[in-house]
A protein has these predicted regions:
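Compact, glycine-rich, soluble single-domain proteins
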Residues: 1-72
């Protein structure tokens, strides 16, 4: 399952991040690494996903979240 398929108010564990190195490093700097808990707070209509990682909230586009593999 990918994070882009996540449901609101649900917590997931990041299994893999299949993005270019630069974007993956940026997500790591924000605290999103393999094994990290991620909560989907909201899913906006234009493809934006609001997530909470290690106490920090931020928005990610579908073009990024569809490459982040997660498990419940």
């Amino acid at each position: 399952m990918y994070l882009s398929d996540g449901k609101k108010e649900t917590q997931y564990i990041v299994k893999d991040i299949g993005l270019p190195t630069g974007i993956e490093k940026r997500l790591e700097a924000l605290g999103m690494t393999r094994g990290t808990s991620v909560t989907v707070l909201n899913s906006k209509s234009k493809g934006i996903l609001i997530v909470k990682v290690r106490g920090t909230r931020f928005a990610l586009g579908r073009n990024i979240t569809e490459h982040i593999s997660v498990a419940t």
